[in-house]
Amino acid sequence: MLFRFFLSLFLCLRWTQPASNPYLSPPSLPPSLTAPRVQELLGAITDLGCPIDLDTMVDCRKCNIAATGGFIANHQGLKEGEYKPKVVVCEDNLLGSHYVAQTLAHELVHAYDQCRAKVNWRSCYHYACTEIRASTLSGECDFIEEFDRGNFGMRAQHQECVRRRAELSMMVNESCKDRAKEVIEKVFARCYQDTAPYDKIP
């Protein structure tokens, strides 16, 4: 437990240092930030014209819930149409830069969707769609990840993983959790096939 605490603290400190810190400046970027999926998503968000400031966008904190991260579409109460999301990384539930990168990729898919489509987070259908996309594109349902969870040998395993993890993500939304499975099934085919900003599932 003590090792886990110090490892989590170390990972988080690498995200909360000032911008002048070499960890946040090339060529010494933290491994989680240099992960290809994270880099591609950050670039895609920028290409859409949405500003990114990692010093304020990424918040590493102790979450005290069974989650690795979260996404806040507008954390400063800005006017409609303004883009100022917050990506939360839960320091108490991550054990290495691989998982930090995976969590960042998941939450950055939400940030991309917010920039591209102005997600209505009150709509269970919009919420389900972005969770399906995040689980599909972040790498959390890759074969090796499912193998480590003991889930393998099933047909369409990737799709089953995406359904399962999207439903888990929707459980934190009081307005949608009772309808999560139903809503996911209604939008699954369309949202699973929407792999933007990638040409296909990476």
Question: What is the meaning of each model-derived region?
Answer:
Residues 86-89, 94-99, 104:
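Acidic, Ser/Pro-rich intrinsically disordered regulatory regions that embed short linear motifs
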